[in-house]
Amino acid sequence: MATVSTNEFKGGLKLMIDSEPCVILENEYVKPGKGQAFNRVKIRKLLSGKVLEKTFKSGDTCEVADVMDIDLDYLYSDGEFYHFMNNETFEQIAADAKAVGENVKWLVENNTCMLTLWNGNPIAVTPPNFVELEVIETDPGLKGDTQGTGGKPATLSTGAVVRVPLFIQIGEVIKVDTRSSEYVGRVK
C-alpha cells in the first residue's frame, strides 16, 4: 500500500485510519513554541460518516485508502438497492440504502452521480451539485403577502422539502443546490 507523509496532508485526501477509509476535511499544521510540530486533522469516516479530530506528529506517515471515485448514471431503485450504470462500459453497480444515505432525495433518473468504491463495493453516493426538480406541493402565493420574506416550504418530486420564494407555484421546475438544500432558481 502507498503511504503519505503528514507534510502532504490536504483536504479531500483519503486515508486508512483504524483499518477504515477516511477523508480529510480540514488540516491544520501547528508549530508550538516548545515541542515538536504536529498536524491537527479533522476527518470523516467514509463507512459510518462520523467526524473525528486526530493529531499526527510532523513527519509521520499514513496509509492511503484504496478507494475510487467514479461517475455513474442513476437508473432506478428496486426498493432495496439503487442501481447505477457506467456510460462507457454499460456495467451496472447496485448501492444499498446505507451508501446512498440522505442523498436519496436528490437522486433523479439519468443524472450523473459520483460513487465512492472501496474493495469494489459502493460506500458513498454523491449527487450532482445542482438538480432540477418539479414542485408537487406548496402553499399558494397570495398577492401582497410580502411580510417575512423567508419564503415558503415546497415539496419536490423526490420528496425533498426546500424553502422557495413566494412566487413559486405547483408544477414549476426549480433548480436546487444539493449541498445546502437551497433553492437556486427557476428552470425555463
UniProtKB/Swiss-Prot annotation:
<dbReference type="InterPro" id="IPR013852">
    <property type="entry name" value="Transl_elong_P/YeiP_CS"/>
</dbReference>
<dbReference type="GO" id="GO:0043043">
    <property type="term" value="P:peptide biosynthetic process"/>
</dbReference>
<keyword id="KW-0648">Protein biosynthesis</keyword>
<dbReference type="InterPro" id="IPR013185">
    <property type="entry name" value="Transl_elong_KOW-like"/>
</dbReference>
<dbReference type="InterPro" id="IPR014722">
    <property type="entry name" value="Rib_uL2_dom2"/>
</dbReference>
<comment type="function">
    <text>Involved in peptide bond synthesis. Alleviates ribosome stalling that occurs when 3 or more consecutive Pro residues or the sequence PPG is present in a protein, possibly by augmenting the peptidyl transferase activity of the ribosome. Modification of Lys-34 is required for alleviation.</text>
</comment>
<keyword id="KW-0963">Cytoplasm</keyword>
<protein>
    <recommendedName>
        <fullName>Elongation factor P</fullName>
    </recommendedName>
</protein>
<keyword id="KW-0251">Elongation factor</keyword>
<dbReference type="GO" id="GO:0003746">
    <property type="term" value="F:translation elongation factor activity"/>
</dbReference>
<dbReference type="InterPro" id="IPR012340">
    <property type="entry name" value="NA-bd_OB-fold"/>
</dbReference>
<dbReference type="InterPro" id="IPR001059">
    <property type="entry name" value="Transl_elong_P/YeiP_cen"/>
</dbReference>
<dbReference type="InterPro" id="IPR020599">
    <property type="entry name" value="Transl_elong_fac_P/YeiP"/>
</dbReference>
<dbReference type="InterPro" id="IPR008991">
    <property type="entry name" value="Translation_prot_SH3-like_sf"/>
</dbReference>
<keyword id="KW-0379">Hydroxylation</keyword>
<dbReference type="InterPro" id="IPR011768">
    <property type="entry name" value="Transl_elongation_fac_P"/>
</dbReference>
<dbReference type="Pfam" id="PF08207">
    <property type="entry name" value="EFP_N"/>
</dbReference>
<dbReference type="GO" id="GO:0005737">
    <property type="term" value="C:cytoplasm"/>
</dbReference>
<comment type="similarity">
    <text>Belongs to the elongation factor P family.</text>
</comment>
<dbReference type="Pfam" id="PF09285">
    <property type="entry name" value="Elong-fact-P_C"/>
</dbReference>
<comment type="pathway">
    <text>Protein biosynthesis; polypeptide chain elongation.</text>
</comment>
<dbReference type="InterPro" id="IPR015365">
    <property type="entry name" value="Elong-fact-P_C"/>
</dbReference>
<feature type="modified residue" description="N6-(3,6-diaminohexanoyl)-5-hydroxylysine">
    <location>
        <position position="34"/>
    </location>
</feature>
<dbReference type="Pfam" id="PF01132">
    <property type="entry name" value="EFP"/>
</dbReference>
